[in-house]
Amino acid sequence: MTLQTNQTEKFTLPDLGKIQLQNFYNFLTKIIYKELKAFPKIYDSEHNFEFKIYPEEFFLVEPILNERESIYKSITYSTELYVTAELNCIKNQTKQKQKVLLGHIPLITSNGSFIINGISRAVVSQILRSPGIYFGSQLDSNSKCIYTATIISESGSRLKLEIDDRKLIWARISKKRKVSAIVLLLSMGIKLSDITRSIEHPAILDNILKKKNVLSNQKDAILEIYKQLFSAGGDPNFSDNILSELQRTFFQQRCEIGLIGRSNLNKKLGLNIPDEEIFLLPEDILATINYLIKLSLGIGSLDDIDHLKNRRVKSISDFLSEQLKNALNKIENTIEQSIKNISKRKRILTPKSLINSGILLAFFKDFFGSHPLSQFLDQTNSLTELVHKRRISSLGPGGLTRRTASFHVRDIHPSHYGRICPIETSEGMNAGLVASLASNATINTMGFIESPFYQLNDSSLFDKPIFLSAREDENFRIALGNRLAIDQEIQEKQITPARYKQEFINTPWSLANLRSIFPWQYFSIGASLIPFLEHDDANRALMGSNMQRQAVPLLITERPIVGTGFEANIARDSGAPLISNIDGKIQYLDSEFIEILGVDKKTYKLKLSNYQRSNNNTCIHHRAIVQLNQWVRKGQILADGATTIRGELSLGRNILVAYMPWEGYNFEDAVLISDRLIYDDLYTSIHIQKYELEIKINHQGQDKITKDIPHIDKYFLRHLDENGLVTLGSWVEAGDVLIGKLSSQEREDSLKVPEGKLLQAIFGLQIGNSRDTSLKLPAGGEGRVIDIQWIFQDEGGIDSNNFVNVYVLQKRRIQVGDKIAGRHGNKGIVSQILSRHDMPYLQNGTSIDMVLSPLGVPSRMNVGQILECLLGFAGKFLNKNYRITPFDERYEREASRKLVLSELHKAKKLTGYPWLLEPENAGKSRLFDGRTGETFNQPVTVGSAYILKLIHQVDDKIHARSTGPYSLVTQQPVRGRSRGGGQRVGEMEVWALEGFGAAYILQEMLTVKSDHIHSRYDVLGAIVTGTTIKTPTTTPESFRLLARELRCLGIQINDIEIYHETLQKKEIEI
């Protein structure tokens, strides 16, 4: 998409998915070489053998399987890393040089995700405190203000310097221990005379040197730090071991600041130290001390830790670089061990035999499988996928935690504008900690977020945009308006809102240095899809942007009548449509392939996705939109995805809505819908479930796939073929066997089964050596079998298992209990489905599709839905689509309202329907009751709204249980739908029943229906025989558990019955 505001200005929106791809490209081209270059030469103990690699000769091999085949076969999509290695025998002066496989590296897909064991995963970028120096202030234990300087290393370790109210300067070694800053400087090798010369205020230094026992040489300083750091008692003697230990645990961890830290220190302290000097130097400490002294004297400024100039983004390349470094260290250790033992080996070693190629992939798989920021890719729809890859998180290793993060950290900062979206974030405990990049933001090589701006000067009014980080744009006046509002000759219009030094000001246009590019430059791609965004409360806009990510792809999608113009860009960059890579002519076309005859006379074959399952069980599907013999250009869309139409994002449907109460069925957030949505498949979605069966091979034998399953009704086996697999295309229902399987078991195990002992005792029979472990369709899984696949593992041997996957497709129509939502945070649950004849209808006889509550608008302040609804209504009659950019009010007061009313007026003139725009009730019209034919008392707001069906569906939520599993400890029903659990009668539920005096119901719920073991069996027998249910005489299991826990504390509880007549005691065991 391009925006052109005059003859010379043109700006193209960036590729929204390129951040991940560029970052991984940087890893492949630069970081791998850098880490291989750091790989040392390895010698044996006698220096007879030398092993080394040639980093400049590394290369990667193209994967054998493509992305789609890797998912289908449940393997990792990866490339092989080869490097030239050399083993020299120095004694014999012989050399062996070979190209060796160093290991496998997972590859990023064209969509910016990774495929690990057949599952798509996304790596979320992490935003952390940048390495460097930060000055702050805090109160000490005596409530006196002290100034601090925190130096953050590249690994995240911290070194803290502080100046107290007595003007003494300390270096904090740990939370509780500190040493004089002079001691730290002496330990770094600088002389006391040099320190005296470098301090700008000698009087403060004299104050420190007046103290007793001031150290004066490097060895004593190192011993002092060692004693404080390791709490060493006595007076340790200086040795090389102490020096190396201190070097490893203190100086290397806390003093390696890296390139970013060095740049940060140079800028803050005004130093000219080369960027290659990545370790902390004595000059840095001296400059820090001087700055602290100035702060104590009221000179200088403190740092804002939440400013984006002090935070950097840790991306894919940084994470993978760490794993590569660790893997190479392990490879180095294994080679070292092998070479050390070389004299004991009789066989001749080669470079290939020294390297274990499995180490590298093991490290990467461990990262992708266990790291909190390597996440299961959210594939509900194509927007969700793109947003997930553009997410940035403050959580994770080295970051914040959701429980300890303060409100200050979560809040919006002025430096976020144009870089991090102020609207889209998680709800709940992650609010403000997980955010989304703004639509035009990019991440530079140093990891800082940049935003584009236009320069405003006489020489080049509309030049190429410049990308600035938060540190660089701080001293510029950035105009937030644009020239359309400024060029008018009204004096008041010459003042424009601007951003300057973290403040929002009004400034003359002539004083502005930069201006923003797009109105939606400040928002994420999710928020950029909301039309009339400026008329919505920010909380509801947040919900709207989050709920668009939960919309399920529909069977029949539709473009929104009212959009923002951003839909096509998001659809294209999400990877959902199939795009041509060449110019050519469509030679062949069907539902599986498209063949293009290129201008070079070569044939290119492109495969379409056909009803494939996503990570969220939604459908990934392609529909060809080109025709046979059609000429196509490079970049042209050949096939639409499940959520695109003609390359434009389409997540929902435009339906006729009315804002009115209807018999209480749309009370609160309930929604009334017409049966037309069901019969015309307007909200029918496709869901694909995957059922997996493992075929084990162990010492007892191999599992057998067969149709002959004993003790199962033949009705449930009706879909199996002669091999025991379900037939493709079968309609299966709950309880049907999908794969028949018998697992072998030992004879002793079969006797442990109760019926085994019974059969043996009565008939002398022995039950079989196999048990039924068939794959059965669970409740609620009814559907059509669309695919069966076998997965054979490469490893042979006794414990290698194979898998069979069965894919079942469900077509779900909208029903009561499903969740629906608009784009403005207006969500609701379907409460009633009415016949279209009973629904209210317009004056031209058209029935309303959905009735929403009018009380959901004023209190929530999302008026954008009303403007969208009315403009969509006009577009429906005018057969027009609208693309509205936000903040149109800066051009003219009431611009949005005027646009809507003018379009309604055009629709009224075109159709001749006067009720489309009535002067006394603008935007409202009279509706008729479908049941009686009479008009309602009040005119009603009617329009066409874009409504989405969300993934929160009643089929996945509804659950019922009669009997099922019980918790072993409490003997109460387990929790959760997935485990077949039950409801728990808690404290408040007991109060509710007590309030109504329902004593018997309460007793049943707390005993026979819950955890009274013997009584619940008696109840079942009483129901079957029709006898009276006896009142339990003993205590339930939860009370017995309490008694046992009290016994652990030494408190004995006894239950004693005393008979009134004889006064005899009878003790009952609890």
Curated annotation (Swiss-Prot):
It catalyses: RNA(n) + a ribonucleoside 5'-triphosphate = RNA(n+1) + diphosphate. Belongs to the RNA polymerase beta chain family. GO terms for molecular function: DNA binding; DNA-directed RNA polymerase activity; ribonucleoside binding. It is found in: Plastid, Chloroplast. InterPro entries: DNA-dir_RNA_pol_bsu_ext_1_sf (IPR042107), DNA-dir_RNA_pol_su2 (IPR015712), DNA-dir_RNAP_su2_dom (IPR007120), DNA-dir_RNAP_su2_hyb_sf (IPR037033), RNA_pol_bsu_bac (IPR010243), RNA_pol_bsu_CS (IPR007121), RNA_pol_bsu_protrusion (IPR007644), RNA_pol_Rpb2_2 (IPR007642). GO terms for cellular component: chloroplast; DNA-directed RNA polymerase complex; mitochondrion. DNA-dependent RNA polymerase catalyzes the transcription of DNA into RNA using the four ribonucleoside triphosphates as substrates. The lineage of its organism: Eukaryota, Viridiplantae, Streptophyta, Coleochaetophyceae, Coleochaetales. In plastids the minimal PEP RNA polymerase catalytic core is composed of four subunits: alpha, beta, beta', and beta''. When a (nuclear-encoded) sigma factor is associated with the core the holoenzyme is formed, which can initiate transcription. It comes from the Eukaryota. This is DNA-directed RNA polymerase subunit beta. It comes from Chaetosphaeridium globosum. Its main location: plastid. The keyword Transferase applies. GO terms for biological process: DNA-templated transcription. It is an enzyme of class 2 (transferase). Gene3D superfamilies: 2.40.50.100, 2.40.50.150, 3.90.1100.10, DNA-directed RNA polymerase, beta subunit, external 1 domain, DNA-directed RNA polymerase, subunit 2, domain 6, RNA polymerase alpha subunit dimerisation domain, RNA polymerase Rpb2, domain 2.
